[in-house]
């Protein structure tokens, strides 16, 4: 039986370990993510953050330990099943289909809950039903349009994704992820490449997503954004957790300052 703390948390990580040859990308990671929280995961390059996301989404299988999401053991490695169960992800490098419209792109996310592969979801989002739109399709379209309004993309819904400016492409990727109706959203460096104005807008977007009832794990190098938005922060270094606490604690932790933040960090 799962422990009470595990059942009450959105996500519980227990002794999670991943090796590549003799290298420990993650070494016995322990971590709890509270439901409805913005929980940041920070650390230098090579600390294990991307490996952690790949384990959560089923891209990799752990060598030891377990992942418990909403009280259920995540022992199915298929990424499509993780999506159906309520886990979605964005990527540091934007991954869009450049020749699809903005609306079609978000529709792919909606269809990912019904189809076992992104390619089948792509076909369902792009191809028109032969005898008119089914009720389920109309509902998905309505949900996609609501998300476009939330992200301020309604006016560009018929443009190709490749025609959008960089900041709007970031918004579009977030909209597509939310279209899968996740309860846990993994954000991989969403502020990468953004200017200060776009980063401030991103701050508002992330808190808005949290206010929709979505728990968020944020991997990000912009420490001003991380410290200003996070409820809790876990710090990794060489695959090992070196600190876990509220932002004020993390800023003062000498291990974090030495390994990652540095003495002269300005927040």
Each PLM stretch: what is its role?
Residues 2-267:
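Glycine-rich phosphate-binding loops of nucleotide-dependent enzymes
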């Amino acid at each position: 039986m799962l422990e009470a703390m595990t059942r009450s948390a959105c996500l519980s990580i227990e002794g999670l370990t991943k090796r590549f040859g003799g290298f420990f990308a993650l070494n016995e990671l322990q971590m709890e993510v509270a439901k409805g929280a913005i929980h940041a995961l920070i650390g230098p390059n090579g600390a294990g953050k991307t490996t952690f996301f790949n384990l959560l989404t089923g891209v990799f299988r752990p060598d030891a330990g377990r992942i418990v999401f909403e009280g259920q053991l995540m022992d199915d490695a298929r990424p499509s099943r993780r999506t159906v169960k309520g886990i979605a992800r964005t990527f540091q490098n934007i991954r869009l289909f450049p020749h699809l419209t903005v609306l079609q792109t978000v529709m792919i996310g909606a269809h990912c809950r019904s189809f076992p592969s992104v390619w089948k979801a792509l076909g369902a989002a792009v191809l028109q039903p032969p005898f008119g739109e089914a009720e389920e399709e109309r509902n998905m379209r309505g949900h996609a349009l609501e998300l476009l309004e939330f992200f301020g993309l309604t006016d560009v819904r018929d443009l190709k994704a490749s025609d959008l400016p960089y900041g709007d492409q970031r918004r579009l990727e977030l909209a597509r992820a939310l279209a899968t109706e996740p309860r846990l959203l993994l954000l991989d460096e969403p502020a990468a490449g953004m200017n200060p104005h776009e980063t401030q807008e991103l701050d508002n977007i992330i808190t808005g997503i949290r206010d929709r009832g979505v728990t968020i794990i944020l991997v990000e190098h912009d420490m001003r954004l991380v410290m200003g938005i996070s409820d809790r922060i876990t710090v990794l270094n060489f695959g090992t957790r070196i600190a876990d606490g509220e932002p004020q604690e993390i800023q003062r932790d000498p291990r974090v300052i030495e390994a990652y933040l540095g003495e002269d960090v300005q927040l």
